[in-house]
């Protein structure tokens, strides 16, 4: 069984940051080894990617002013200002700034 590499994007989410903080605390207290923490984070990367791809079906549209965009290492980054999101249920949510990171579902070089 070959280990597929997953992007680590979701480690920067509130859930990922909480997990990382908790793992750091456990390492500092000597309750787990750093290698176990890395295995847990790798599992988190895989599971959150699979769950979001399989379970999330809500659609939204958004409109805003594109401030900055970048394309580096097969990853697009968009910084958008004055954004309005419109959800499936017609609810509207506004934000001053939004950062969108978009990458291929497969890493470069993967079949």
From Swiss-Prot:
SUPFAM superfamilies according to UniProt: Transcription factor IIA (TFIIA), alpha-helical domain, Transcription factor IIA (TFIIA), beta-barrel domain
Alphabetized GO MF terms: RNA polymerase II core promoter sequence-specific DNA binding; RNA polymerase II general transcription initiation factor activity; TBP-class protein binding
One Pfam match: TFIIA_gamma_C
Segments traversing the membrane: none
Main location: nucleus
Subcellular location field: Nucleus
GO terms classed as biological process: positive regulation of transcription initiation by RNA polymerase II; RNA polymerase II preinitiation complex assembly
Any one annotated GO CC term: transcription factor TFIIA complex
Superkingdom assignment: Eukaryota
Transcription regulation among keywords: yes
Keywords for the protein's UniProt record, in alphabetical order: Nucleus, Transcription, Transcription regulation
Family (UniProt): Belongs to the TFIIA subunit 2 family.
Quaternary structure annotation from Swiss-Prot or TrEMBL: TFIIA is a heterodimer composed of the large toa1 and the small toa2 subunits.
The protein's role, per its UniProt record: TFIIA is a component of the transcription machinery of RNA polymerase II and plays an important role in transcriptional activation. TFIIA in a complex with tbp mediates transcriptional activity.
Protein name as annotated: Transcription initiation factor IIA subunit 2
Organism expressing this protein natively: Emericella nidulans (strain FGSC A4 / ATCC 38163 / CBS 112.46 / NRRL 194 / M139)
UniProt lineage: Eukaryota, Fungi, Dikarya, Ascomycota, Pezizomycotina
Gene name in the database record: toa2
């Amino acid at each position: 069984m070959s280990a597929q590499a997953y992007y680590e994007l979701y480690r920067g989410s509130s859930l990922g940051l909480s997990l990382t903080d908790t793992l750091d605390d456990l390492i500092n207290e000597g309750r787990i080894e750093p290698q176990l923490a890395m295995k847990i984070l790798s599992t988190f990367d895989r599971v959150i990617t699979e769950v979001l791809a399989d379970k999330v079906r809500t659609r939204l549209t958004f409109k805003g002013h594109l401030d900055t965009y970048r394309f580096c290492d097969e990853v697009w980054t968009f910084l958008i200002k004055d954004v309005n999101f419109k959800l499936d249920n017609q609810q509207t949510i506004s934000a001053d700034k939004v950062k969108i990171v978009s990458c291929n579902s497969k890493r470069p070089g993967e079949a």
